[in-house]
Design a protein with these regions (language model features):
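A short alpha-helical cap/connector motif
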Residues: 1-112, 122-167
Length: 167
């Protein structure tokens, strides 16, 4: 994870005025976790839905050659036909409706190796409800509740299981 120092420098150079106000910002620990998760999953295609944040630097840097897209709204969410979604990061706690719709679009395009990450699953009653809906989705096999983040795995060979982990 030798890119951490380079990523920190790039993050400091980012103009904070270009990032929207009112969005939940990820901690350094969370950004590094996202980096490690992309590194673990080795996705060909990764998608981020929500407010633009500096976490995108970490997501995009974790795997060279990966296709990485960001969408702030459904209007910006363009997926090619039959293109799988290997990694999805949902992170707009103020708009669970957007996250719900993005999940519905992307859940049909998962592979057994797909990994979805949801930020702010404990942020509000509506986000807690959204997390419960995700855990009950028929595509989802294994979940990890990390309090701030939720991880969703889709491998049908796995036994359906939900874990709660202190992170």
């Amino acid at each position: 994870y030798y890119k951490y120092s380079t990523l920190r420098q790039e993050e400091k150079r980012m103009d904070s005025s270009t990032l929207p106000q009112g969005c939940c910002k990820e901690t350094l620990q969370m950004k590094r976790l996202l980096y490690r998760l992309v590194n673990f999953a080795q996705p060909s295609n990764a998608l981020s839905v929500g407010c633009p944040t500096s976490a995108h630097l970490y997501l995009a840097a974790a795997k060279q050659g990966m296709n990485f897209w960001h969408a702030s709204s459904l209007d910006e969410l363009f997926l090619d036909a039959d293109e799988p979604v290997d990694f999805l990061y949902l992170h707009d706690v103020n708009n669970p409706g957007l996250l719900r719709q993005a999940f519905a679009l992307c859940a049909e395009r998962t592979t057994p190796q797909s990994l979805f990450v949801v930020q702010g699953i404990g942020y509000s009653p509506s986000m807690r409800q959204f997390w419960q809906e995700l855990k009950g989705d028929s595509h989802v096999m294994v979940t990890f509740d990390l309090f701030d983040f939720g991880l969703l795995f889709f491998d049908p060979a796995k036994q359906r299981q939900h874990y709660k982990v202190s992170f």
